[in-house]
Design a protein with these regions (language model features):
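The canonical Cys-X-X-Cys-His
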Residues: 33-42, 92
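Electrostatic cytochrome c docking/interface patches
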Residues: 14-32, 48-50, 61, 66, ...
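Positively charged n-region of N-terminal signal peptides that target proteins for export
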Residues: 1-4
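Cleavable N-terminal signal peptides
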Residues: 7-8, 18
Length: 102
């Protein structure tokens, strides 16, 4: 299923090949410091802040890209998402996608 999703994303230009190659989980953990100030690594939701643990990598990347392009409304997330390069988004997606809710 993931393979089909990625092929469709490539076809429509939603995800670059660099992102789909998969990220470095250790690098993602290193980069996650700012994320976990609001999004708990335990997978619990806090108020209106969504849990991001266990998200599919392609969904995580697509959502972060839409924040960076200001297609989704949240000034904090727009600012945070715009900071990351493709390899960093892939690493974050791999890290959070690989965590299991506690």
């Amino acid at each position: 299923m993931l393979r089909i999703t990625l092929m469709v994303a490539f076809a429509f230009g939603a995800i670059s090949p660099a992102l789909a190659a998969g990220g470095d989980k250790a690098f993602g953990e290193y980069l996650s410091g700012e994320c976990v100030t609001c999004h708990l690594p335990s997978g619990r939701q806090v108020g209106t802040i969504p849990a991001i643990v266990g998200w599919p990598e392609d969904s995580f990347i697509a959502i972060m890209q839409s924040y960076a392009k200001k297609e989704r409304d949240n000034q904090v997330m727009q600012t945070v998402a715009a900071k990351f390069k493709d390899d960093e988004l892939a690493a974050l997606a791999a890290y959070f996608g690989g965590l299991k809710p506690k």
